[in-house]
Amino acid sequence: MLRQETAPLVCKFGGTSVGTAQSIRRVCEIIQEERPSFVVVSAVAGVTDWLEEFCRLPKGKRAALTEKIRERHESIAKELGIEVSLAIFWEILEHFEDVEELFSEDQARILAIGEDLSSTLICSYCCTYVLPLKRLEARQVILTDSQFLRAVPDLALMQTAWGELALQEDTIYLMQGFLGATSSGKTTVLGRGGSDFSASLIGELCKARELRIYTDVCGVHTADPKILKDTQLIDSLTFEEMQELASSGAKVLHQDMLKPCVRAKVPIFVTSTFNVTKEGTWICASLNESTEGPVIKALSLKSNQALWFVEYNSPLVRLEDVLGCVRSLGFVPGVVMAQSLGVYFTIDWEEYPQTITKALEAFGTVSCEGPLSLVALVGAKLASWSMSRVFEALHRTPVLCWSQTDTVINLIINKDFGVAVTELLHDCLFK
C-alpha cells in the first residue's frame, strides 16, 4: 500500500488540529516525530467563517470582526510563548473595512488571510523545536485560473513552477492550504475545504509515498460520528468509494482532493491529531478484499438539496449537454439519474437562481423541488443489492427518487427525515 520510504510524506492538518495553542503544540510534536517533507495547514477553526462574514457585511460594520480575528491569533501566540508580527494581515483587513463593494478578487485576498495567519503562527512555533522547517508560499506553487473564489489549479503551470523550486531534501516545508494565485500573482482560493485539495496537489507534485490527513476524528466511519452514535471505524476504502462518500455529504475529506491522488497513485491515510493509538482509514486505488457479494461500507447524509428534472423536448438532447450547461453556470451536479425522456440531478438548494431554469429550458420542461435530503449508501458490488431490505427498514418513509450503481445507492427524501433515515439504515446495516 505504501511506496518506498524514501519518497516524501505529506501531512495536512485541518482547522480543529490548529484551533488552539494546545492543539498547535500537538501538531508540532507530530511534525517532530514523523518528519514529513511537506506540511499543509488550514486556518484556525472558525476563522474562515468569520472572514466570510466579513465579506458579507456592509462597509463600516466589519471592524468588529477584524478585532475578533486579531484577538484570537494574538491570544494563541501569547499562550505559545512566541513573538511574531501579524501586523501586515491586520492592515489588509483594515483596508477592506470601509471598501464599498468587495469584488471576488478582494474576497479571495480576505479569505486567504486565515491560512496566512495560521501558517505564520505554526511556522514560528515549530522553529522553537529547532526543526529544519521553512515556509513554502502557496502562491508560488498552487497556480490557478482567475475564478478567484473557486479557482481551478493549472497542473501544467504548477509542474513547471515546482521544477524551478530549489527544495532541499533534509528540510520540512510548511505551506498554507486553501489558497493559490494566478500566473500574474493575484490571490485565489480553492473553495471551502480546499486545504485537503492543496495537500493532494502537493502529494501529486512530489510523488509522495503517502498523504496523511490529520483531523478531529480517527478516520472515516460508517456514518458521521457527529450525527450518529455507535458508528464504526472503516479500515480501508477505495478512491471510488471515498469519492462517492465525499460527493454525497461526508465532510471528512474535500471531494476534489481525490483526483490528484488518483492520478499519482498516492495513498491517503485519515487519522486524528489527538488519538495516540494512531488508528485511521486507508484510502487507495484498490483493496485486497475477497467479498463475493455486495457490501455496504458507509452511509452519508447531505442536507439542503434541490432535485431538478429536465424533461427533454427532443430525442436529440444529450445528457452531457444538459450537465455541461449546469456546470457552465458555475454549479456542480451531485447525483445524476438519467432516463430516456429526461434527467434528474441535484445541486445545493441555496444555488437556485432563475438563470439555471432559463438556461435549461433550451433542452425541455424544467422543474425543481426542495429543500430535500440525500442519503447515500456506499460500498462495493451494489448493482445487485436488493433494495427490499432498504425499503423495509424505512417503513413508511417516502422515498421521492432513488438510483443504484455498483458503488452507491442514492435516496432522495424529505428534508425532515434525513437524520432519522440515516439512523434507521445504520442500525439495520451495521448493528
UniProtKB/Swiss-Prot annotation:
It catalyses: L-aspartate + ATP = 4-phospho-L-aspartate + ADP. It comes from Chlamydia trachomatis serovar D (strain ATCC VR-885 / DSM 19411 / UW-3/Cx). GO terms for biological process: diaminopimelate biosynthetic process; homoserine biosynthetic process; lysine biosynthetic process via diaminopimelate; threonine biosynthetic process. NCBIfam families: asp_kinases, PRK05925.1. One of its GO terms (molecular function) is ATP binding. SUPFAM superfamilies: Carbamate kinase-like (SSF53633). This is Aspartokinase. The keyword Nucleus does not apply. Keywords: Amino-acid biosynthesis, ATP-binding, Diaminopimelate biosynthesis, Kinase, Lysine biosynthesis, Nucleotide-binding, Transferase. Belongs to the aspartokinase family. GO terms for cellular component: cytosol. The keyword Nucleotide-binding applies. Transmembrane segments: none annotated. Its EC number is 2.7.2.4.
